[in-house]
Design a protein with these regions (language model features):
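Juxtamembrane intracellular "pre-TM" segments in multi-pass secondary transporters
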Residues: 2-13, 207-233
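Extracytoplasmic gate region of multi-pass secondary transporters
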Residues: 37-39, 230-256, 260
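Cytoplasmic helix-loop-helix junction between adjacent transmembrane helices
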Residues: 115-151
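C-terminal membrane-cytosol helix-exit motif in multi-pass small-molecule transporters
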Residues: 190-210
């Protein structure tokens, strides 16, 4: 940790640096299962006999449940152990991946994506943000968020090619290429998601994760915040950013539909 000291990080940040990186990795890994079908769109559609519309429903239901969950996740993150919430979110999402290995029909898949919308968004993201704050020294919060976002990117860069290798391994192992490849990808994402949850449970501390009664937010406080113009500007910027980011996920299916035989309308 001498290197971290040379970088000017405080004692608390140095002590919890590994935990911050594990939370960051989990913040990337947990979304592998809900979103992997965009990366393997055609193979996923063929393996599970899905239409383009049905796959679109998965994204919609995941987003709706996530939006509802966000309304309550922050409240829960202030009152329950963030270590426990992060671990349960990761492990629950991973177990959902193992359920995906069963021969599920369309309504059952909709229920699964609804479940993922709850486990990966409900308290997970508010807990990620809070974890970085409580694990960092007061003077290091900006640097810690930088390390957090950077580690998320590194985890994603490592995870994605490994998933491709898993898919390729499945294609070589079975004549039913798409089905076997998809199963290998699901197993890969499920295992690393559960493993990530166990690592967070093992390495993370709960110091300062619960707020005192004097710090609890009231409806009057919420009203005060909502009257701040800066809050609405930040919300608009965030909305525009996510619209662009999520639009990227549709490039793959759209290009496949136009350059190859369509799956089904």
């Amino acid at each position: 940790m001498n290197l971290l000291a040379k970088l000017g990080m405080g004692e608390r940040t140095r002590r919890n640096f590994v935990a911050i990186l594990l939370v960051a990795a989990g913040g990337s890994i947990i979304y592998g299962l809900p979103y992997f079908h965009y990366d393997y769109y055609e193979a996923y559609a063929q393996a599970y006999h899905l239409t383009n519309t049905q796959i679109g429903v998965f994204g919609s239901i995941f987003g709706v449940f996530g939006m509802i969950s966000y309304l309550f996740g922050g409240y829960l993150a202030d009152r329950v152990s963030i270590r426990l919430l992060l671990s349960l979110s990761l492990i629950g999402t991973g177990l959902g991946g193992f359920i995906h290995l069963l021969p599920l029909n369309f309504p059952e898949l909709v229920a699964l994506y609804s479940f993922w919308g709850f486990t990966s968004l409900f308290a997970f993201w508010p807990c990620c943000v809070k974890a970085v704050r409580v694990l960092s020294s007061p003077e290091d919060k900006g640097k810690s968020f930088g390390w957090f976002e950077g580690a998320r990117g590194v985890a994603s860069a490592i995870m994605t090619p490994l998933a491709v290798i898993a898919f390729r391994f499945g294609m070589n192992a079975d004549g039913k290429h798409d089905i076997a490849g998809m199963r290998q990808v699901i197993v890969f994402y499920s295992v690393i998601t559960v493993f990530s949850g166990l690592l967070v449970l093992w390495k993370m501390r709960d110091d300062g994760s619960k707020i005192d009664k004097s710090e609890q937010v009231t409806f009057k406080d919420i009203g005060t915040v909502l009257r701040m113009p800066a809050i609405w500007i930040i919300g608009l910027v965030t909305f525009c950013n996510y619209v662009f980011t999520l639009s990227v996920y549709y490039f793959t299916p759209l290009s496949l539909i136009h350059i190859s035989e369509p799956t089904r309308p």
